[in-house]
């Protein structure tokens, strides 16, 4: 089986965290025996990325015996669905179905438009993969599959705390809280995390908030082993990779009730879901800091190991191809349907928002 993965997010030397989960999945699919080709969409003029991608995709399909196209994110899925030569699977990541949230926790109008386009697209592709039950509830049920992103257990594994701190140049006596996202992305809610850290530091001056942003996956894993707790106060998520990676490193955490966090942490000791209240977050983190133990989170997320998730994705591919072999016809959207949500101006704004959101 040959699969063409199409994406506008993919790690580079300058941005090693950008779309790292897409690369992880591509590598796990290859390891499982899938013949994977990549089409990474980019252009020096961002407004031209998606219109240009339509031609790039057609040329690639004309010159390759691809069985199926797997697109990451709704906008890329719209590009993929402008052709009907091969079936299309789209993985939605969160905001492309749920909409965008600003720094005040309010929904943005453009985000609502993009989410509407994503939901329309889900009815027109051969399969839609989403990250959580919440996302699944927003789209047509006949072809939706809940498959959260996997965790690379080889990279994200526990390292002795002192050893990790030495490698990162951190102080051995400090109590570090980790904020592992871009502080400039409003939905990640950095000011709240800073307020929680300040609240705790008034009673315990050894507490310090660390920000890990745009790090390589290997360094991020070290931060997770070096720190005492993850603070994750996001307004909205699909299935947050940071939470799953922290679980794989046995890092205690306190999170808002977003995406599938509650399901991920389950009954793991020293992992908490809290209301977005500074005193409540601070109280839970103080409990963690009182004994500074590690969790057994890694054992709770074995089902999210790369090989296990790859098999679930492959099962979707196989089901789609069997259906195609049976000559089942998908509903084709009108040209106007797709073009209305592929306008260059909106595509430009959407890509910028996706880039900001996916920086760790």
Question: Which residue ranges define each predicted feature?
Answer:
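Membrane-proximal helix-turn-helix segments that form the acceptor-binding/catalytic region
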Residues: 58-59, 108-127
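Active-site proximal beta-strand in glycosyltransferases
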Residues: 3, 68, 83-100, 128-129
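Conserved acidic donor-binding segment of nucleotide-sugar-dependent glycosyltransferases
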Residues: 267-278, 286-291
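Conserved donor-binding/catalytic core segment of Leloir-type glycosyltransferases
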Residues: 4, 170-188, 194-197
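Aromatic "clamp/platform" in nucleotide-sugar-dependent glycosyltransferases that forms part
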Residues: 235
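Short hydrophobic beta-strand element within catalytic cores of glycosyltransferases
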Residues: 252-255
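Acidic anion/phosphate-binding donor-loop and adjacent secondary structure
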Residues: 151-167, 324
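Short alpha-helical donor nucleotide-sugar binding micro-motif in glycosyltransferases
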Residues: 122, 222-227
